[in-house]
């Protein structure tokens, strides 16, 4: 059941959007097809209906849509010219500001999207080690739209086997699996690529998700899975790449690496670092990063990132102001608290409806997730779509993932509680009755599937 606006989008744009996570197959059929503005934690559709949003531009907005101070900072840079023939003062200031924030990095290069940044990290690793194999964590959903990653998913069409056979998957929080892969491809591995954390903590002794506490009760300073990964990489002369697109400027200001006490060789950042403005970064140790430089005469060159708009001043200005706003307003702590309140509210309502076995929220509080199970305890995309559908009726965008922002405050949580109470009544009927009766339109689908 495709709407008129979606049909127009599909006619002009392959997939109907510029990232597959925004596709019509990721939302219930009653979801707004298009939006025209956002403010705080809310989006407005083309009919001026207001929706509380838990997608927050695919986690790119951690403060709120259209934050005045950040917008003004970007506009100031536009008025100055936005993009020059050589480097700008803003470019220098942003690089210095970034390196003061991300303590483990000696150099940084900016980009416009995370895919470019992570692929640049992989290229640096291959150049530094003169090795080809990439070990990437299969439990982390996305690293890049480039062939080295997409070829390791179900969607291999258009990618030569010679490329994707060089990417090998390993499991998160399973250090023995990583050891086995390193042993199997001994002296062939350029890098290990993973996110610091997704739905659970990096703990090698157990994998029980997140403890769920506002203040994490686990001690990561002495030992954790990421430390073991780091040690393995060091022992085997493999470049340790930490992709902090989601965790950066969200878990801690200095990234999850600050929280989990690790020092990656290369890190990548993006998403929340400029509150929705297009910017990403690859950063790391000088001895690796400087391979992409040009001043050392006679050294073989590595063609790193080279982008006309990579240092666009409006995005860099927004980045600087975003970090200042985060510091001044204690955004990191607020988002952890907002997410904790979301999880607690979700589970309180589910418990009261007798659904907690089939429907619950969990995860790191600043980036929670929810689980939808059928009466046999099996994950159900149909039930997930029904929940999304019922939340839309209450004017709440409730996507596959939950992205918490600064403005998901007590009022937003109260609105969410009221909506959940109504939505869960339908969900309960769908769990114990004929599920398909309660779904209008089609179920959502996984992004990474071989066929449409």
Where are these regions (language model features)?
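Conserved N-terminal phosphate-binding loop of PLP-dependent enzymes in the Aspartate aminotransferase
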Residues: 1-452
């Amino acid at each position: 059941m495709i709407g008129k606006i979606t049909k127009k989008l599909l006619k002009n744009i392959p997939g109907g959007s510029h990232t597959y996570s925004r596709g019509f197959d990721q939302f219930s059929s009653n979801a707004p097809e298009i939006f025209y503005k956002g403010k705080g934690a809310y989006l407005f559709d083309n009919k001026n209906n207001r929706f509380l949003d838990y997608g927050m531009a695919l986690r790119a907005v951690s403060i709120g849509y259209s934050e005045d101070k950040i917008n003004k900072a970007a506009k100031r840079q536009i008025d100055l010219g936005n993009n020059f023939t050589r480097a700008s003062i803003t470019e220098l200031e942003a690089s210095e500001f970034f390196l003061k924030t991300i303590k483990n990095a000696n150099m940084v290069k900016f980009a416009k999207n995370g895919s470019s940044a992570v692929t640049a990290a992989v290229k640096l690793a291959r150049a530094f080690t003169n090795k080809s194999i990439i070990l990437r964590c299969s439990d982390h959903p996305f690293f890049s739209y480039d062939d080295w990653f997409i070829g390791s998913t179900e969607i291999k069409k258009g990618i030569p086997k010679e490329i994707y056979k060089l990417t090998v998957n390993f499991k998160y929080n399973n250090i023995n699996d990583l050891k086995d892969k390193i042993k199997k491809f001994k002296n062939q591995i350029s890098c290990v690529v993973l996110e610091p954390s997704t739905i659970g903590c990096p703990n090698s002794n157990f994998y029980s998700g997140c403890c769920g506490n506002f203040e994490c009760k686990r001690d990561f300073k002495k030992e954790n899975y990421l430390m073991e990964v780091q040690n393995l990489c060091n022992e085997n002369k493999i470049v340790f790449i930490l992709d902090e697109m989601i965790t950066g400027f969200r878990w801690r200001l200095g990234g999850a690496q600050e929280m989990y006490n690790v020092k990656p060789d290369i890190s990548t950042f993006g998403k929340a670092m400029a509150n929705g403005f297009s910017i990403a970064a690859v950063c790391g140790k000088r001895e690796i990063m400087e391979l992409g430089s040009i001043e050392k005469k006679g050294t073989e060159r590595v063609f790193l990132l080279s982008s006309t708009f990579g240092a666009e001043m409006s995005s860099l200005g927004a980045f600087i102001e975003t970090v200042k706003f985060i510091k001044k307003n204690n955004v990191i702590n607020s988002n952890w608290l907002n997410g904790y309140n979301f999880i607690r509210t979700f589970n309180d309502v589910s418990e009261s409806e007798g659904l907690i076995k089939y429907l619950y929220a969990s995860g790191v509080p600043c980036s929670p997730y929810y689980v939808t199970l059928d009466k046999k305890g099996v994950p159900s995309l149909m039930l997930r779509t029904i929940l999304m559908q019922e939340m839309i009726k209450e004017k709440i965008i409730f996507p596959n993932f939950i992205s918490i922002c600064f403005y998901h405050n007590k009022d937003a949580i109260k609105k969410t509680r009221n909506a959940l109470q109504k939505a869960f009544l339908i969900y309960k009927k769908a769990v114990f009755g004929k599920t398909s009766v309660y779904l209008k339109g089609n179920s959502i689908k996984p992004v990474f599937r071989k066929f449409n």
